[in-house]
Amino acid sequence: MSFVRVCSVGDVAAGGVLAVDIDGPNGVGIAVVRDGDDWYAIDDECSHAAVPLSEGDVSGCEIECWMHGSRFDLRTGKPTGPPATEPVPIYPTKVDGEDVLVDLTTTLND
């Protein structure tokens, strides 16, 4: 695994989401979500409408797309509400001190 720093713990409020664009060969746009002490990194593009998930609402372990209301489980990337039917990639995430780290070379839901 190859973790990279994506933000500081203080950058994301509890129950909040932060859009992060990562440059480089594995560069992607991700949504970093904080649910209490749990952290998640999910691809920042709805599999239904191709709009940023980071602009949607977070409730528990789900993020809702602002456009059509598709919901995705932050732990699995699977859609939990229509109209989306395809999952979105999720990435290993950990906290080291005040740094939030994500491994973009591995997806947890292949």
PLM region spans:
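Short cysteine/histidine-rich metal-coordination sites, predominantly Zn2+-binding motifs
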Residues: 60-66, 79-88
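Short cysteine clusters
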Residues: 46, 65-68
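N-terminal pre-ligand scaffold of iron-sulfur
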Residues: 1-60, 74, 90-110
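Short helix-to-coil "ATP-lid" hinge immediately C-terminal to the conserved N-box Asn in the Bergerat
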Residues: 71
